[in-house]
A protein has these predicted regions:
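Anionic ligand-binding catalytic core segments
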Residues: 1-81, 85-201
Length: 201
């Protein structure tokens, strides 16, 4: 299997946009944090860096929040600090397009979230999260509010992940995955959606 992605860091004239990943922006590196430095942190760290480095941070924050929820629902347990970046276009920085969006649970049993600190080290976890070890919708609602998003926008984003779109099922069933892996992929996503929808007391 080969992973191919279109370069988004090259301008039409062939020049490269300046890019910096969030491991660098939050000061994590192998020399100080060790081999697994890119997993050392929480998503709150990225949110704080977005506010610090991106002038139009509210727009970037909403995109970031969508990515965090997407990665959870679609089983990407490898969404670490180096898989989020900012890029400079003209005089301003913005959140780089999403990349490395894969269902890693097809191959590796790992954590629900790619960073070892989860969503936040300071936010209270829902009783569902505490009891099962898996976040539910309430945890993402709290996280969205904590990073500065409006409640109405949070609800709209979370509602969009409450059902498996027909297009996803169609794409998976028509992919080059084996029949067994197709079933596994869809099972993982459906299980995540059910977990996501659990009510917290």
């Amino acid at each position: 299997m080969v992973y191919i992605t279109k370069r988004f860091d090259i301008a039409k004239d062939g020049s490269k946009y300046l890019m910096e990943d969030f491991a660098s922006l939050v000061g994590k590196n192998e020399a100080e944090q060790g081999t697994f430095f890119k997993y050392d942190g929480c998503f709150e760290d990225i949110a704080c860096a977005i506010k610090r480095f991106i002038p139009a941070w509210m727009i970037a924050m909403e995109r970031f929040f969508k990515l965090v929820v997407f990665n959870y629902i679609y089983g990407n347990g490898d969404d670490h600090l180096k898989n989020f970046s900012i890029m400079r276009i003209g005089e301003h920085y913005q959140l780089a397009p999403a990349y490395d969006l894969m269902n890693t649970c097809l191959h590796i049993e790992g954590d629900d979230l790619g960073l070892n600190g989860g969503l936040s080290l300071t936010l209270e976890k829902s009783d569902v999260y505490e009891r099962t070890g898996h976040p539910c919708r309430l945890d993402f609602e709290r996280f969205g509010e904590y990073i500065g998003l409006k409640k109405k926008r949070i609800e709209m984003i979370l509602d969009s992940f409450s059902l498996l779109p027909d297009e996803v099922e169609h794409l998976v069933n028509n992919s080059f995955l084996t029949e067994k892996m197709k079933r596994t992929y869809l099972r993982i996503v459906k299980e995540r959606i059910q977990r996501f929808k659990r009510k917290s007391e």
